[in-house]
Amino acid sequence: MANFKKVKKGRNLRRKCELCETNIEYVDYKNVEFITKFISGIGQIKPHVSTGTCARHQRKVANAIKRARFMALIPYTKDKIRVLAPAASANTAQAPAEKAKKEAVAA
């Protein structure tokens, strides 16, 4: 009998580096629109797995982002929206079960 190897069918999930395909050698820190593609919503530098860049271009992008931050072209962090809860009073802080017990005792 012949030994047949199982062929795994699947897609090639690996992305090609956008910078390699367009032959970009220098990532300009002044090009804020281009750099913001590599920054998350919080302001962190995205990893190469999510951006699809190769290691060489990931280093160049990271350096460009750091330079742009230092030159105050982009912020270090994004503004977070903070929702403050209203101060709880003594009546609203009690659990409903405790309220029911107090009402039963009072009646």
UniProtKB/Swiss-Prot annotation:
Keywords associated with the record: Ribonucleoprotein, Ribosomal protein, RNA-binding, rRNA-binding
UniProt keyword annotation of Transcription present: no
SUPFAM superfamilies (UniProt xref): Ribosomal protein S18
GO molecular function, one term: structural constituent of ribosome
GO BP field: translation
One of the record's GO cellular component terms: cytosolic small ribosomal subunit
One Pfam match: Ribosomal_S18
InterPro entries per record: Ribosomal_bS18 (IPR001648), Ribosomal_bS18_sf (IPR036870)
Function text: Binds as a heterodimer with protein bS6 to the central domain of the 16S rRNA, where it helps stabilize the platform of the 30S subunit.
Similarity annotation: Belongs to the bacterial ribosomal protein bS18 family.
The protein's assembly and partners: Part of the 30S ribosomal subunit. Forms a tight heterodimer with protein bS6.
Protein name according to UniProt: Small ribosomal subunit protein bS18
Organism: Mycoplasmopsis agalactiae (strain NCTC 10123 / CIP 59.7 / PG2)
